[in-house]
């Protein structure tokens, strides 16, 4: 089971794609905790996030508009996690539908996990260049 933390400060234009990529995961043992940072409860960002909370019992939205900074927001969000494993999702991220399924299988087998990303903006390609396969701390 995985708690997904999604702090939001800006990026209203990405919320729908990002949250949809979580709702469409093949692995269904997750919760999504959205932390709104820097926006009051009557803001468009907050209202959009609350709509997802209404649509899915797995999504919870919390108001952190008085907390400054992503790190401080993430630290505050951890108290709301139900599960031992935590994944971080930025508002401009989209996850492959099998991301959690594959990573949870790998984590259960190996006990440690890492990932790679694909840039989908104006710089196409895979970044960063991390070797595929078993890696150690020495590979970084």
Predicted feature residues:
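Nucleotide-sugar donor-binding/catalytic module of glycosyltransferases
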Residues: 1-140
């Amino acid at each position: 089971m995985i708690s997904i933390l999604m702090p939001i400060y800006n990026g209203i234009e990405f919320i729908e794609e990002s949250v949809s990529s979580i709702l469409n995961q093949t692995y269904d043992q997750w919760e999504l905790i959205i932390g709104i940072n820097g926006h009051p409860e009557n803001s468009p960002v907050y209202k959009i996030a609350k709509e997802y909370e209404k649509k899915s019992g797995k999504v919870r939205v919390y108001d952190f508009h008085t907390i400054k900074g992503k790190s401080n927001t993430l630290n505050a969000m951890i108290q709301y996690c139900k599960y031992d494993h935590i994944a971080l999702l930025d508002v401009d991220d989209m996850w492959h539908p099998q991301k959690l399924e594959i990573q949870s299988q790998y984590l259960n087998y190996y006990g440690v996990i890492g990932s790679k990303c694909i840039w989908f903006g104006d710089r196409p390609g895979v970044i960063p260049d991390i070797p595929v396969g078993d890696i150690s701390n020495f590979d970084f």
